[in-house]
Each structure stands twice: as C-alpha cells, then as structure tokens.
Amino acid sequence: LDRLAYLEHAGALISAGVVQSYGHAADEYAALTRSTALVDASTDARLDVGGTDAPVFLNRLLTANVRHIAPGQGTPAFLLTSTGRIVLALYALRENEARFSLVAGGVDAATLLAEIDRYLVTERVELAPLESLQALLSLQGPTAAATLATAGLPRPGAPYAH
C-alpha cells in the first residue's frame, strides 16, 4: 500500500507508537476552532511527585502556589531555577494531599525528572516518571463539552480538573 496515499486522508498514521500525520493542518485547525478535536499529549513528559514534603517542595520550585490546589484540580506553572529563571512551563495536577502529577510539553520525562531532582536534598519526596503507566488525551474545541455529554462522560468542573 502506498503510504503517501494514506497521508491524504484525515486521521493518524501510527508507526511504533508515534503519530506520523494527523491529516491536513486546515482540518485540524477547523476541528479545534469549530467542533471537537481529540489531542494526543502522550509525548508530554509526566512526572509523579509524592511524599509528605511534596507540596512544600513544589511550592519552592514553581510559580504557582500548589499548597492551595484541591485534589483533582490543577494549575499552569513555571519551573524556576534557584535564581528565579524560568526553566520550563508545566501543569501541576494535584492527585491527593501528598501527590502531584507534573505535565510538561517539549521535554522528555528524564529531563523533567533531572530538573526537579537537582533541588531535592533532604525532603521526603519521591519522583517517578509516568510515561509507561498512562496515556494523556485532551478533548478540545467549542463543542468538547457536548461531545463529552454525548459520550455520557462528565464535564470537568474547572480548568485542569482531572
């Protein structure tokens, strides 16, 4: 079969788990702005940060006050150096009182782990990449809520809810 012929059709071609094409960019943009698009963010780095000191530890490293995020909620934040320079943008998602998931695009899990780990000294914090444990999908667009309802799924109550 001609691989290039498949590229003319909407939808992803997958080879070894990596999307090669989502179709035409104009169709992707139309789905995101006029209807619903399922965005695969599985290549984003995901890191589990847990332990009794996790909220205080992350609060020192991120621009967001993660101590006040309720479980099941999240917030965008920047990871900072000790001098306040931005290292990368990420989302901090609170799983429970002592566990967070950090999600960052444009970087792999090993890099995210190394950036966080360099500031870990005596804190009771455990770090573990989440790459192989789960997929990360995002339903986006103006009709995303209706699509969720049609599928019988609840709409998240707030931005970054999970």
Residues of each region from the PLM?
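Basic, glycine/lysine-rich polyanion-binding surfaces/domains
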Residues: 1-162
